[in-house]
């Protein structure tokens, strides 16, 4: 992000897309050197295939998919509009990239120290905490009087809520879904989250175009409160 912001500020924005294309080519070259993994198609696997999607009938799983739909949609929307909010508050593009860089470091610290709290609290408690963090973050963005408040909020809260929810997702899915279906269940949630991101990006764009980014953040805070209620 830091490099992309520097490119946008000091060179041509088109150079960003060229760099992404080069990175993609390098990734493809790297994968060419890996070994293929062979999968065996046994009769036992075929017999179990019919039960692979039985989790779709589990009420707890369906509820979690809905909760994830709300959370991921707002989280992705925040990733798009929080840098724009900082620019509206007067920050240059390069400084915005620096803030995003350090907020990612905070995310890494949450991951590294997750062992201290992930097994000490229930999934519901952790999920409520993630929603509470997002509500506080969105309300602070919506009411930020200057860039300083928004920057501090971004550094402290931007990555914590989303990272925490991602870790909770795996914990809860493993608790409500049979072991053989965990990967499929996570895949369904991932697809749902992708649809949520597309829908929320469109709705968010319409709302910002007709009102303001601050109104958008008030709306997202309301959706996160709805998610908290569903979690209860």
What feature does the model see in each segment?
Residues 21-40, 230-232:
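C-terminal membrane-cytosol helix-exit motif in multi-pass small-molecule transporters
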Residues 125-140:
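Structural signature of the two symmetry-related core transmembrane helices
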Residues 181-210:
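A late C-terminal transmembrane helix in Major Facilitator Superfamily
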Residues 8, 110-122, 208:
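Helix-to-loop junctions at the C-terminal end of transmembrane segments
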Residues 6-22, 206-224:
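A membrane-interface helix-boundary motif in multi-pass transporters
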Residues 164-177:
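Intracellular juxtamembrane helix-capping segments at the cytosolic ends
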Residues 61-98:
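Extracytoplasmic gate region of multi-pass secondary transporters
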């Amino acid at each position: 992000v830091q490099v992309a912001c520097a490119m946008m500020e000091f060179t041509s924005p088109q150079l960003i897309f060229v760099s992404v294309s080069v990175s993609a080519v390098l990734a493809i070259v790297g994968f060419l050197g890996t070994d293929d993994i062979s999968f065996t198609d046994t009769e036992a696997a075929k017999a179990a295939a019919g039960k692979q999607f039985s989790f779709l009938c589990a009420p707890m799983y369906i509820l979690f998919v809905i909760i994830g739909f709300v959370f991921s949609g707002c989280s992705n929307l925040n990733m798009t509009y929080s840098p724009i909010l900082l620019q509206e508050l007067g920050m240059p593009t390069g400084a915005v990239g620096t803030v995003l860089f350090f907020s990612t470091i905070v995310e890494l610290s949450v991951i590294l120290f997750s062992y201290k709290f992930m097994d000490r609290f229930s999934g519901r408690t952790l999920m409520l905490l993630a929603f509470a963090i997002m509500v506080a973050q969105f309300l602070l963005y919506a009411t930020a009087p200057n860039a300083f408040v928004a920057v501090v909020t971004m550094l402290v809260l931007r990555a914590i809520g989303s990272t925490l929810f991602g870790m909770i997702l795996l914990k809860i899915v493993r608790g409500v879904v049979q072991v053989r279906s965990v990967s499929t269940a996570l895949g369904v949630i991932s697809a749902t989250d992708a649809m949520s991101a597309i829908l929320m990006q469109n709705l968010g764009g319409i709302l910002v175009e007709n009102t303001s980014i601050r109104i958008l953040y008030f709306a997202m805070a309301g959706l996160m409160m709805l998610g908290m209620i569903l979690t209860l």
